C-alpha cells in the first residue's frame, strides 16, 4: 500500500498544477530559442532614435532584423506606455498597438507559446514590461532588465492560435544621454515550442536579437 501511495504521489506530482497560464523565466537568448521550433511573429518596442527619422521604434514581423512593418514613437524616460497585441484567428491577422500606432501582420506558422524579452545594454538604463493580461486573465509575472541586463519571461498554457489579446505596459528609463537602436527594447516573441527543447539553435536568429 505504501508503495502504491508513493507511486501515485509521483505520478500526480508530474502533472500540470493548472490548465491555465503558466510562467517561467529563462536565462539566455540561446535557451529561449531552444524552446521555439518556429517563430510566428515578434512585436517589438525599442528606443530607436526616440521618434526621429533615422530609424524606427516599433516593429512587427517574423524577424526583428528585417521587420515586415515599422512605426515611429517618441519614447520619454519613465513614462508608462500601454500596448496591445491581438491575434484574430478568422482573418489570420496580428496587430500591435502602442502610442496610437497600430501595426499589422499575417503569420505564416502556427504557435502556442510566447516570450516577453526585455534588454538594457547600458548602465543607467532600465526597461520593464508589467501589468500583463492575457484574454482577460492577469499573467501574474513581469519582465524587467536593468543595464546591462536581460530578462525573458515565458508564458504558456493557453491555446493562443485560436485567437488572443494580450495587454500590458512598457516603461523605458534612462539618465543622461539616451541609448539608441535596440540597446533598450522589449519583444513579444510568439512561436511554436516543441515538446523537447531542440539541441541546436540558429545563430542567425540570435544575431537578430542584438542588432
Residue spans of the language-model regions?
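Short, basic/polar N-terminal leader/transit segment immediately after the initiator methionine
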Residues: 3-6, 22
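Mature extracellular "passenger" or substrate-interacting domains of secreted, surface-exposed proteins
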Residues: 20-194
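Positively charged n-region of N-terminal signal peptides that target proteins for export
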Residues: 1-4, 211
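A short, hydrophobic C-terminal helix/tail in secreted or cell-surface proteins
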Residues: 198-210
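Sec/Tat signal peptide C-region and signal peptidase I cleavage site
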Residues: 15-19
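Bacterial N-terminal signal peptides
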Residues: 5-14
Amino acid at each position: 500500500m505504501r508503495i502504491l501511495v508513493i507511486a501515485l504521489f509521483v505520478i500526480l506530482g508530474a502533472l500540470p498544477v493548472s490548465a491555465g497560464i503558466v510562467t517561467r523565466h529563462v536565462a539566455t537568448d540561446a535557451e529561449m530559442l531552444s524552446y521555439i521550433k518556429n517563430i510566428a511573429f515578434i512585436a517589438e518596442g525599442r528606443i530607436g532614435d526616440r521618434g526621429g527619422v533615422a530609424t524606427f521604434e516599433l516593429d512587427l514581423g517574423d524577424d526583428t532584423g528585417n521587420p515586415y512593418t515599422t512605426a515611429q514613437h517618441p519614447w520619454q524616460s519613465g513614462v508608462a506606455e500601454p500596448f496591445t497585441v491581438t491575434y484574430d484567428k478568422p482573418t489570420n491577422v496580428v496587430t500591435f498597438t502602442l502610442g496610437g500606432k497600430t501595426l499589422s501582420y499575417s503569420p505564416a506558422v502556427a504557435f502556442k507559446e510566447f516570450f516577453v524579452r526585455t534588454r538594457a545594454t547600458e548602465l543607467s538604463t532600465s526597461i520593464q514590461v508589467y501589468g500583463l493580461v492575457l484574454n482577460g486573465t492577469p499573467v501574474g509575472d513581469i519582465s524587467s532588465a536593468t543595464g546591462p541586463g536581460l530578462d525573458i519571461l515565458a508564458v504558456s498554457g493557453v491555446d493562443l492560435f485560436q485567437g488572443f489579446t494580450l495587454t500590458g505596459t512598457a516603461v523605458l528609463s534612462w539618465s543622461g544621454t539616451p541609448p539608441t537602436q535596440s540597446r533598450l527594447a522589449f519583444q513579444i516573441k510568439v512561436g511554436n515550442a516543441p515538446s523537447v527543447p531542440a539541441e541546436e539553435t540558429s545563430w542567425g536568429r540570435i544575431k537578430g536579437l542584438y542588432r
